[in-house]
Structures are given as structure tokens and as C-alpha cells.
């Protein structure tokens, strides 16, 4: 299911990932790989949160990091900037599912907050 021969099609069923991705890490990677199994293509939506709370990375940096991490899936992903979405609401019979993907305990322990703290200690982030 890698991306080389695949051609993105907006009409095909598509899964959505919504998040801050500050920064993209192995937990996000595993989540992406599980979500990709659902439909074969994923729209990764990046909330516009640069400068809000502890969100040091701008959209272009986040997008670059995602594409670098997912280069083998490049034709199966779109990365889009969206407003700072905090609520997802829907009416009945909308034609899509909202699903929680539960990953293994080790993956769930990965913390972007701790990653940012380590990056600051190493001088890689202000």
C-alpha cells in the first residue's frame, strides 16, 4: 500500500487525521499507518495553532516533517492547513464515521510535549 503507483483521487473514500503534529512523531506515524488501512488515502489536517500555547512549529515546517516521515506514501496523503478546530459536530446520517484508533500502550506513551522539552534541552527548539 505504498504510494509510488497510486494516484490520489478526491472522489475515493478518504480518511481524515486532524491534529497539531507539534512535532510529527512515531506515535503519529503508527496512527497514520492504521488509518491508511481504512481507505487507502489520508487527508492529514494541520490545525492552525502556531504561537498558541506550546505550538512552536508553523504549518510549512509541520507539512515538511510529515512529508519527510511519509515519503513512501506521498501519493496517498494530502496535508492541509485548517482553522484551530476544537469541535467536530455532525447531524444524523451524514455518511461517514468518527472512529477512535487505539494503539498499543508503548505507542500511547509517546508524548509530543516531552519531545519538545527534549528538543529545547538539546538546543533544537527555542
Regions found by a protein language model. Give the residues of each.
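Nucleotidyltransferase catalytic core that binds NTPs
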Residues: 1-126
Amino acid at each position: 500500500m505504498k504510494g509510488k503507483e497510486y494516484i490520489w483521487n478526491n472522489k475515493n473514500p478518504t480518511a481524515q487525521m486532524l491534529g497539531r503534529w507539534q512535532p510529527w512523531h512515531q506515535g503519529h506515524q503508527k496512527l497514520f499507518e492504521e488509518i491508511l488501512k481504512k481507505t487507502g488515502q489520508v487527508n492529514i489536517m494541520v490545525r492552525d495553532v502556531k504561537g498558541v500555547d506550546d505550538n512552536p512549529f508553523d504549518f510549512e515546517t509541520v507539512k515538511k516533517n510529515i512529508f519527510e516521515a511519509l515519503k513512501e506514501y506521498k501519493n496517498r496523503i494530502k496535508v492541509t492547513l485548517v482553522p484551530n478546530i476544537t469541535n467536530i459536530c455532525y447531524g444524523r446520517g451524514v455518511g461517514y464515521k468518527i472512529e477512535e484508533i487505539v494503539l498499543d500502550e508503548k505507542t500511547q506513551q509517546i508524548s509530543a510535549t516531552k519531545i519538545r522539552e527534549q528538543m529545547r534541552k538539546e538546543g533544537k527548539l527555542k
